[in-house]
UniProtKB/Swiss-Prot annotation:
Example GO biological process: ATP synthesis coupled electron transport
Protein's UniProt name: NADH-quinone oxidoreductase subunit K
Gene that this polypeptide is encoded by: nuoK
UniProt xrefs under PANTHER family: NADH DEHYDROGENASE SUBUNIT 4L-RELATED (PTHR11434:SF21), NADH-UBIQUINONE OXIDOREDUCTASE SUBUNIT ND4L (PTHR11434)
Family per record: Belongs to the complex I subunit 4L family.
GO CC terms in record: NADH dehydrogenase complex; plasma membrane
């Protein structure tokens, strides 16, 4: 049977991969957004695992809210990247830092 420790291990691995991906690849904005989504996925796995372990549904409901916010964040982030790419011709992080504002 798959226990709580298995879910926590998978979530810890996903969280670590997301954080390492952000620190290792600082040049591509799309990869950074994907790593943030990976971190949010690890958080959701923890929420659902603890929710089922404790027999409470609040963690699962909160995971749905996190999924909704993550989807909105990804959509807005990609829309901003498309507009930025059309204006600058590049999506490198160095170019984003040079924006006025």
């Amino acid at each position: 049977m798959i226990g709580l420790s298995h879910y926590l291990t998978v979530a810890a691995i996903l969280f670590t991969l997301g954080v390492l991906g952000i620190f290792i690849n600082r040049k591509n904005v799309i990869v950074i957004l994907m790593c943030v989504e990976l971190i949010l996925l690890a958080v959701n796995i923890n929420l659902v695992a603890f929710s089922t372990h404790l027999g409470d549904i609040v963690g699962q409901v909160f995971a749905l809210f996190v999924l909704t916010v993550a989807a909105a964040e990804a959509a807005i982030g990609l829309a901003i990247l498309v507009v930025f790419f059309r204006n600058r011709g590049s999506i490198a992080v160095e170019d984003v830092n040079m924006m006025k504002g």
